[in-house]
């Protein structure tokens, strides 16, 4: 049943003008389209107001800002045919044309990436995200500046846009967008979700993931309240879970854009990041066990070590990008039809698990990640794992030789 069918009242064309904390109820003041002022009492107030950040402003919640990238974007009236950007027959045949038409496509280079996103109505969103350490952000103050930047860094795409002469529907820019409110879930019965509470980075498009995580945690907290339980400890636990995911994503993107020009290392990073995302908390979430404290306790060591291993590997990728010479990788590395470690982790997301099976799957996934990390060191640096940054984190793992073979095949087309 929909929320409306369950008796939820939806007030359309209204604007919240004030929220006052109270016990047992908060007071919410809002105005309607006609200008009338109304008040209502609410035991819980949940802020999904996005960039308006109503509760952060009303309750003066401090926000922590991290090193941030800069973005500019615009929409054009028309469909961009990504296949028209190349005449390379091998590249054109790599995936069906419709796949590129329906998907987000990325163009990447040192310190930046460009998105091409098909929208409804045959419109297209085009965006540029840069690390200010590599690109002067004032270039993106205007649409003309962004076009000039594209001409320099993505001349093939810039020439394509020029030849099509699309009508530009709008232009936006944003910097300093990485932040997290210092309080997201309160025992005073208010909570923040979506970008009203935090935002990481657009790379990997994690926004809806964090919305889903926050909403799941909020529903758990409301359930605790309805059951008559105190909220201090559950709120603290929810905060810790959310922040762990947030900080993990920050480590994935912060100071990482410089890697993009190194084909070998960014390929390794993409394979690692995807496999990691599907191996632990993501697997538990897809099995509706994200807030199951019993299962969380049984895999707590694995989840903790996954997080530490991931953070360490991000440091390793940065080091490799400056110390390891680039070399060609196979052109169809990501769009690969060979069964491999990443695909197995992804398939497990949609496989129903009993509690015991889920615990065992998380443990197997951690061992596979250890095997992947060790295989990366062997393949990229030819370095003894005992002399590496990850030696302690992978201690006691059981090596899976098939992971090493699959990695070699994915990167170089050589499974030996």
Where are these regions (language model features)?
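FAD/FMN-dependent oxidoreductases across multiple families
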Residues: 110-112, 118, 122, 134-260
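Context-gated lysine
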Residues: 21, 57, 64-67, 79, ...
């Amino acid at each position: 049943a929909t929320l409306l069918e369950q008796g939820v009242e939806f007030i359309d064309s209204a604007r919240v003008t004030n929220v006052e904390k109270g016990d047992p109820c908060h007071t919410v003041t809002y105005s309607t389209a006609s200008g009338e002022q109304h008040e209502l009492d609410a035991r819980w107030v949940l802020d999904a107001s996005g960039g308006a950040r109503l509760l952060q402003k009303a309750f003066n919640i401090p926000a922590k800002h991290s090193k941030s990238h800069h973005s500019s974007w615009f929409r054009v009236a028309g469909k961009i045919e990504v296949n028209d950007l190349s005449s390379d027959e091998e590249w054109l045949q790599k995936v069906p044309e419709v796949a590129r038409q329906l998907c987000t496509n990325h163009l990447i280079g040192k310190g930046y990436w460009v998105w091409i996103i098909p929208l409804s109505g045959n419109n297209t969103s085009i965006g540029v995200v840069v690390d200010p350490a590599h690109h002067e952000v004032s270039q993106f103050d205007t649409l003309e500046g962004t076009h000039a930047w594209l001409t320099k860094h993505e001349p093939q795409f810039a020439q394509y846009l020029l030849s099509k002469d699309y009508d530009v529907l709008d232009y936006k820019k944003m910097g300093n967008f990485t932040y997290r409110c210092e309080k997201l879930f309160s025992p005073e019965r208010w909570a923040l979700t979506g970008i009203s509470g935090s935002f990481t980075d657009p790379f990997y498009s994690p926004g809806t993931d964090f919305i889903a995580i926050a909403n799941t945690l909020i529903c758990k907290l409301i359930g605790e309240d309805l059951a008559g339980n105190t909220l201090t400890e559950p709120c603290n636990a929810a905060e810790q879970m959310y922040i762990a995911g947030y900080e993990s994503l920050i480590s994935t993107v912060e100071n990482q854009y410089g890697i993009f020009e190194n084909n070998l290392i960014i390929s390794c990073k993409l394979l690692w990041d995807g496999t990691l995302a599907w191996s632990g908390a993501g697997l538990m979430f897809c099995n509706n066990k994200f807030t199951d404290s019993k299962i969380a306790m049984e895999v707590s060591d694995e989840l903790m070590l996954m997080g530490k291993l991931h953070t360490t590997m991000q440091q390793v990728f940065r080091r490799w990008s400056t110390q390891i010479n680039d070399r060609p990788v196979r052109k169809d590395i990501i769009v690969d039809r060979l069964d491999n470690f990443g695909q197995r982790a992804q398939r497990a997301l949609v496989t129903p698990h009993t509690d015991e099976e889920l615990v065992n799957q998380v443990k197997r996934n951690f061992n596979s990640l250890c095997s992947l990390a060790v295989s990366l060191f062997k393949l990229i640096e030819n370095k003894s794992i005992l002399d590496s940054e990850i030696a302690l984190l992978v201690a006691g793992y059981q090596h899976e030789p098939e992971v090493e073979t699959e990695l070699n095949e994915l990167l170089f087309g050589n499974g030996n």
